Amino acid sequence: MNKLITKLLFATIAMAGFTACSQDLIEEQKKNTKENPKHLTEFFATNSAKTRTGAKYVTIPSVLDGLLFYWNSGDQIWIDKDNNGVFVKNDGSDIQSGSKLEDANFFFNDQLNATSYKVRYTGNNSSAANEVTFAETQIQTAPNDASNIGKYGDCGVAVATKNAQGKYQFTLQHKAAYMVLSPYSTYGFASSVGVVAVYVTASKPISGKFAFDDNGVGEAKTGAKNTIAWFYKQELLGRKHISSSNSNFRDPQNMLPLPTAADVTQNGIIITMPPGTYEDLTIEYGLIDTATGGYGYYKQTFKNKTLVAGENRVLSRDIKLDTEFDPNEYYAWDAVQDEYYWKGAPNKLRVGRNMPSESTGYATSASDPRFQNEIPGGSTSNVADNAATRGATVAFNHNEALWLILNGEAKWDEWKMYVMNKHLYNGGIWIKTLKQIALERRVTVESLKEGFLGMDFRACPCTNNPHAKRTFNDADANYERPAKADRSKYMFMPAAGYFGRPTLASQQNLRIMLFCGDQGF
């Protein structure tokens, strides 16, 4: 097929929506030096910048400028030999295995004499002239590379005209649409964060078999789907399998980075799609962090977006997550406010899964304001004696915690992502707010602070509390994010883990991040 842009040059300008852009690539053209074999008719495909018609050209600075298509091994064309709507495939070409040509020769085992012939291209290794297949799975092996689009649905039409040398010359008009994604993040993620997959969902079919004629792509055929899955270098076994794409399975070279500004030369994602207007179009970026094991999907939606045949649409998206956890929020219990756990030793704050242990940098005695409050709580009937007096005064008290446990209707959300210390994490619970619980019970929030089911547990030793522990309701509904309409009733608490001792008795003087992504306190 004709290959789209091997290297797209992207403007440093950030584009908020779809913009028609294109780009001229400079690559040494491989010249065809073969003679026209006897008893064969030669069709010569030209792809020069002056005659190219498969893209829209612009000269505005800082915008993509032009498209360049290539012919690769496996490409073939069809011609309407007898002008009766019956197309025949070429019998040979000068495209060698591994070749990438701007111009190519196709040979037909016949002496053809008409002034012109209709030409169709329906993809690499195609089997029909009246049908094109848009691949449900598309794999890209380098940033901003489109060397495989012939396998994924690239197609085109032309009219080949006989020249003075007796050869038929044509320039293909491309009829597929090319969506070029360029995600970035002004947050400034660590280099271990990147994109490994993109899932595209539309309001009408975008993959499978489509009718094809001289006007281009037609209606979807039976079995066509509304989804396309794009992967970088290696295919995921399924959406949920992105959870295994962590440092144990994936080298950082096998993901596309998230620069701080849009730059397709670093991470251009090219997806071949049927042209048309899509009432709803959803793009989900599959993100991973090879340092922390964090993962999840970032969703972007569009309404009434049009993809034009033969043109690329560049979409640049600033990926911003709505939850950020401050790494300086780790405290020993009721330590002095602003005297967080690793204060004064920021190089020790290595947060994530499988992080090394630290033997120094944390408080070891009450003389250090970062040390925990050693006054035992919950041991007397005096509420004041059991109360936090320093940094933990803003924490939920015993009664409030019980209301959250018993009436918060907690829902575990594996896919909720958050950021901390420039890294990506996922996992946490949604739990109803005290305000919502009070509203449902027709009481005040203040009354929830003062007692639980008629008893003030701030003055009750924890050993006598029958409600101190509750098993999580393992129903499927509690592993789903609250419906969007109900989300304001909940608060999200990230499973940010905690710093504790390793399990070995010989390591009791060490501190290590435990249960990050699994537990939170």
Where are these regions (language model features)?
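Sec-type signal peptide cleavage vicinity
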Residues: 2-12, 16-406
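Conserved positions within compact, well-structured domain cores
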Residues: 216, 323-521
